[in-house]
């Protein structure tokens, strides 16, 4: 169990280092890749998740996936909270590492980039704030995400899961990510949001806990539960 918890922690941290890192790289003043845009960012998220899965193997790196696996009987319910806590902590630590790496660029951006934009480097935010619709978008995105991963995992070709999941993230990000930023993962959003709240970032906005708890905090669990029940009931996947 300890080994798996460490793997969940480290895998999530690495995912966040890639993900939050690419946002910092494309937004902060003075970076080599500033202005690279959303395709650059979404592609890095996809590749970064693939790399994390290649390195750490059979990890969830997502509390919503942990819930789905518990519902399917693949992970004991007693492990749901420990796995989820390890993943959120990984998100916090990964974000802190990125902040240290980009500290000079954060400092240079203080008077040029808005506090809201700085917050959005760490955590997701809606393009249009409408909490019921935002909730539905994250629920649906997560339903597609978890359903896709469960289907991909049925293919036994070595190496197909990390590659397939990376492509799935890329497709969801490009096609469905526009309204909310496709968190689909409490650890992906809450970990960096906590880091944003505690780090000594100059001129920062509040961390918008209302949105963080309601939308990326709760909706992915609902989407994952529906995905688990659908994939098991319709396709017989466990």
UniProtKB/Swiss-Prot annotation:
Result of knocking out the encoding gene: Cells lacking this gene show a decreased lactate transport ability. Deletion of this gene does not affect lactate racemase activity.
The name this protein goes by in its record: D/L-lactic acid transporter
Key word Cell membrane present: yes
One term of GO molecular function: glycerol channel activity
Motif (NPA 1): 62-64
Subcellular location: Cell membrane
Statement: the UniProt record of this protein carries the keyword Transport: yes
Cystine pairings recorded for this chain: none
Gene Ontology cellular component list: plasma membrane
Motif placement: NPA 2: 185-187
Signal sequence residues: none
Entry similarity comment: Belongs to the MIP/aquaporin (TC 1.A.8) family.
UniProt-listed PANTHER family: AQUAPORIN OR AQUAGLYCEROPORIN RELATED (PTHR43829), AQUAPORIN-9 (PTHR43829:SF9)
Record-annotated membrane-spanning stretches: 2-22, 39-59, 80-100, 135-155, 158-178, 211-231
Protein induction: Induced by L-lactate and repressed by D-lactate. Is thus regulated by the L-lactate/D-lactate ratio. Makes part of the lar operon (larABCDE).
Pfam families (UniProt xref): MIP
């Amino acid at each position: 169990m300890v080994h798996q918890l460490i793997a969940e922690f480290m895998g999530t941290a690495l995912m966040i280092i890639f993900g939050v890192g690419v946002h910092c790289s494309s937004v902060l003043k003075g970076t080599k890749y500033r202005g690279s845009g959303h395709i650059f960012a979404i592609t890095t998220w996809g590749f970064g998740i693939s790399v994390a899965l290649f390195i750490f193997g059979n990890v969830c790196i997502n509390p919503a996936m942990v819930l789905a696996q518990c519902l399917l009987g693949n992970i004991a319910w007693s492990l749901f909270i420990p796995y989820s806590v390890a993943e959120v902590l990984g998100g916090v630590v990964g974000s802190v590492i990125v902040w240290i790496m980009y500290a000079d660029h954060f400092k240079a951006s203080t008077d040029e980039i808005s506090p809201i934009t700085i917050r959005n480097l760490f955590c997701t935010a809606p393009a249009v704030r409408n909490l019921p619709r935002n909730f539905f978008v994250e629920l649906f995105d997560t339903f597609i995400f978890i359903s896709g991963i469960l289907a991909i995992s049925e293919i036994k070709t070595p190496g197909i899961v990390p590659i397939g999941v990376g492509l799935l993230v890329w497709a969801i990000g490009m096609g469905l990510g526009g309204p909310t930023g496709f968190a689909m993962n409490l650890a992906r959003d809450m970990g960096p949001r906590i880091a944003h709240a505690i780090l000594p970032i100059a001129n920062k906005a509040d961390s918008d806990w209302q949105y963080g708890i309601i939308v990326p905090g709760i909706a992915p669990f609902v989407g994952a539960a529906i995905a688990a029940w659908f994939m098991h009931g319709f396709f017989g996947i466990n």
